[in-house]
């Protein structure tokens, strides 16, 4: 038999397990991952810059930046329309678009910019989406969004879905609301983390030669993950509105 302190120490180690090296900020008594906030601010600044450049001089004959902005808006509008239909998609375009562009920007920032070359006194910079806290937060926001969608349309009648088609399925229907954010968060986190770890290992073995194609694959995979996350978010909202 193992002593009780073996189990307690094991679970403590698992709870404290971290990926990468972090530096922390103490904000109102809470320790937050500072490297996540730094890169998030960088990505948000870039997205804001692109938005300003794309809408600064709107003309009937668009310039290159306006073309870029219009293409991005058309793309996220198509995602929302395909999942939500003509009746509901317009009000959800800002939310779906924000999810897609934020995840897209974070994934590309992690795939293109060599953050690990930036030396810090403590910790290291990386894509925000390779931190489980970021992906869980995005998944929980999505859960709040589809609960809001269902309640705003059906009121408390929305909860009837938990006993449909038969009341026997109540536990399964409740469990589904927990598995949705779990699958969203761990899918995004796992793919981004796997890509960064692969590049790190290959760079240490064969610098420049092998990592370049892997980086290109990471850029593609990051784009696909942003599309999958936003599409699933729109699909969950559409399901709540049915």
Curated annotation (Swiss-Prot):
The chain crosses the membrane at residues 34-54, 93-113, 132-152, 188-210, 222-242. It is found in: Plastid, Chloroplast thylakoid membrane. GO terms for cellular component: chloroplast thylakoid membrane; plasma membrane; proton-transporting ATP synthase complex. Keywords: ATP synthesis, CF(0), Chloroplast, Hydrogen ion transport, Ion transport, Membrane, Plastid, Thylakoid, Transmembrane, Transmembrane helix, Transport. The keyword Ion transport applies. It is a multi-pass membrane protein. It holds the Pfam family ATP-synt_A. It comes from the Eukaryota. One of its GO terms (molecular function) is proton-transporting ATP synthase activity, rotational mechanism. Its main location: plastid. Belongs to the ATPase A chain family. F-type ATPases have 2 components, CF(1) - the catalytic core - and CF(0) - the membrane proton channel. CF(1) has five subunits: alpha(3), beta(3), gamma(1), delta(1), epsilon(1). CF(0) has four main subunits: a, b, b' and c. Key component of the proton channel; it plays a direct role in the translocation of protons across the membrane. This is ATP synthase subunit a, chloroplastic. It comes from Trieres chinensis. The lineage of its organism: Eukaryota, Sar, Stramenopiles, Ochrophyta, Bacillariophyta. The gene is atpI.
């Amino acid at each position: 038999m193992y002593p009780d302190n073996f189990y307690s120490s094991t679970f403590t180690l698992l709870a404290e397990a971290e990926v990468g090296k972090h530096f922390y900020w103490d904000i109102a008594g809470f320790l937050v991952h500072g490297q996540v906030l730094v890169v998030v601010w960088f990505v948000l600044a870039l997205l804001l810059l692109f938005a300003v450049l794309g809408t600064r001089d709107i003309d009937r004959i668009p310039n290159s930046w306006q073309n870029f902005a219009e293409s991005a808006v058309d793309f996220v509008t198509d995602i929302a329309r395909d999942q939500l239909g003509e009746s509901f998609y317009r009000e959800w375009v800002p939310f779906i678009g924000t999810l897609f562009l934020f995840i897209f920007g974070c994934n590309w920032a992690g795939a293109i910019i060599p953050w690990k070359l930036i030396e810090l006194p403590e910790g290291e910079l990386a894509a925000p989406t390779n931190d489980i806290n970021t992906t869980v937060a995005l998944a929980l926001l999505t859960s709040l969004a589809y609960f809001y969608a269902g309640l705003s349309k059906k009121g408390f009648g929305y909860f009837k879905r938990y006993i449909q088609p038969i009341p026997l399925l109540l536990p399964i229907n409740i469990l589904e609301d927990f598995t949705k954010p779990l699958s969203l968060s761990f899918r995004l986190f796992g793919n981004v983390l796997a890509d960064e770890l692969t590049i790190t290992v290959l760079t240490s073995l064969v610098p420049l030669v092998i990592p370049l194609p892997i980086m290109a694959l990471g850029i593609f995979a990051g784009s696909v993950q942003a599309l999958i996350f936003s599409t699933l978010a729109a699909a969950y909202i559409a399901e709540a509105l049915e």
